[in-house]
Amino acid sequence: MKDNIVIITGITASGKSELCDNLIKKHKNISIINCDSKQVYKEIPVITAQPPKQKEFYRLYGYVSARENYSVGLWLEDLKREVNNALKNSRIPIITGGSGLYISSLIKGLSSIPQISQEVRENVNELRKNLSKEEFYKLVLSKDPRIQGKIFINDSHRLSRALEVITETGKTIFVWQENRQPPLFNNFKVYTILPKREDIYRKINSRFIEMVENGAIDEVKNLLSMNPSPHLPAMKAHGVPEIIRYLKGEITLDEAIQIAQTNTRHYAKRQYTWFKNQFPNSQVIDCANKLTEFGIF
């Protein structure tokens, strides 16, 4: 695609949604297209901080069932359709979100990792739950020595993914990542929002309390009433596992809030490192509102 496409990414709670609201007020010829792997799920709009549904401007938010094992490959198909529709209607596509795999697949192309079987996923998940962090890391390292220095002990999601891939395929995940399909776009601008850490951490803490006050607990209750598999992506959205533990009586509400805040801050910390290393051609902004002060198109 030869048309300019804008990608706005960055740390969780960095102000991407507020920025998009401001851009809509300033520019009427834009389409905001979601690039967050959890904001696609229609049953959890509060706990995933989805924007209000203004169909005129927002696309790919809250349109997938939490029962679905939605993937980056499916998202790329949906994204291509929405970008084409925007360009056809003389709108500027603004793709925004902070999911690392989605962003990487968008900019660098989708890796050709085969589908992982449900049996392998469940076995890896059981290992992750039953082993300590140190034991799980040593296990994955013994299966795939190439993770050393690339995937770290606290990154349980990437460790699980690495173990799934080498168990399913017999090849390290890095071999598959080195063989990618061509990216969808060849002409885009990338902006990465990286505010000060203390500002992000403060926003994470206050935002989760607001989510609880605005119905996140009822949202998770409704999610559980669907009896979804615990391995589905929607069940792993930030705050969902902690609220489930509260609803089961395992922890108090205050404990659930504190644990969710801590886990989300740890996630943001990993995002800082990831974004700084992944996209050297990106324009880094320390405050989202700065993007409304100069032309991003």
From Swiss-Prot:
Region Interaction with substrate tRNA, residue ranges: 36-39
Binding annotation for substrate: T12, A13, S14, G15, K16, S17
Gene3D superfamilies cross-referenced by the UniProt entry: 1.10.20.140, P-loop containing nucleotide triphosphate hydrolases (3.40.50.300)
Keywords assigned by UniProt, alphabetized: ATP-binding, Magnesium, Nucleotide-binding, Transferase, tRNA processing
Enzyme Commission number(s): 2.5.1.75
Subunit structure: Monomer.
Stated name of the protein: tRNA dimethylallyltransferase
